[in-house]
């Protein structure tokens, strides 16, 4: 198994005066009429393997496989405005009807820091579930648990972060509960006694905390989303991690209850 992450970092500050007569952008308004690029970073992530297949004890063949290939671009436009874009080359779908994005586009958001302790994230982003396996960079995970493998990890929406202190963070998030219409999610159709939700949102409260010089790390979250009228999905996800030097162990506890089975 081969894992490669190639970062290409470009960090500098570039300033340009606004062209006379041109409508100023949001960034120019925030920075007093200047275009500022604080930093930019591009990462290429590759996870490949050689696979040998057996049927019982009989050798059935061998092949090389690119399990995950991703391109990531992120950085700071201004000291309080950052961006993050990530695309996967292992999956593709036509743009979904709700968010108008293909599943290959995993992340596309901007983060605005309005105070040292408060910030907002707008765009397609991580759904703020708890758990170590869910939070860690997926390029490092060989095989996801069945629960995480079926979760919809990225959705369009908005979230707010409150950094209570260096060891405690509280996040509030509202995102789409799904990317497409009901007929794309439930191929057999909805039950006769329910109708399509007019506001198919998922609401999440996420608490992240660190203890004992960050040796103990907790990532807990509670989520509720409307699937259809009078049908809801509930998630309670807990991540408990101990990390000290080369030692890392974790216990993820995850529970879901759904009014309609999506999986």
Q: Which sequence ranges carry the predicted segments?
A:
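N-terminal regions that are enriched for targeting/export leaders
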Residues: 21-25, 30
């Amino acid at each position: 198994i081969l894992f490669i992450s190639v970062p290409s970092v470009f960090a500098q500050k570039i300033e340009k005066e606004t062209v006379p007569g041109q409508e100023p952008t949001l960034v120019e308004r925030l920075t007093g009429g200047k275009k500022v690029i604080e930093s930019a970073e591009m990462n290429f992530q590759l996870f490949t393997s050689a696979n040998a297949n057996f049927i019982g004890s009989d050798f059935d063949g061998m092949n090389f496989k690119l399990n995950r290939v991703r391109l990531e671009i992120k950085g700071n436009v201004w000291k309080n405005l950052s961006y993050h874009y990530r695309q996967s080359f292992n999956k593709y779908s036509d743009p979904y009807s709700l968010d108008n994005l293909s599943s290959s586009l995993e992340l596309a958001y901007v983060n605005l820091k309005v105070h040292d302790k408060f910030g907002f994230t707008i765009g397609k982003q991580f759904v703020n579930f708890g758990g170590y396996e869910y939070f860690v960079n997926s390029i490092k995970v060989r095989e996801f648990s069945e629960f995480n493998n079926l979760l919809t990890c990225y959705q369009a929406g908005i979230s707010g972060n409150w950094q209570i202190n260096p060891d405690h963070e509280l996040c509030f998030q509202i995102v789409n509960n799904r990317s497409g219409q009901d007929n794309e999610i439930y191929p057999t159709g909805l039950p006769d006694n329910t109708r399509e939700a007019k506001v198919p949102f998922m609401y999440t409260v996420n608490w992240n905390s660190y203890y004992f010089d960050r040796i103990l790390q907790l990532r807990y979250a509670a989520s509720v989303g409307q699937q259809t009228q009078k049908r809801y999905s509930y998630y309670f996800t807990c991540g408990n991690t101990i990390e000290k030097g080369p030692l890392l162990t974790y216990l993820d506890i995850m529970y879901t209850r759904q009014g309609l089975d999506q999986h």
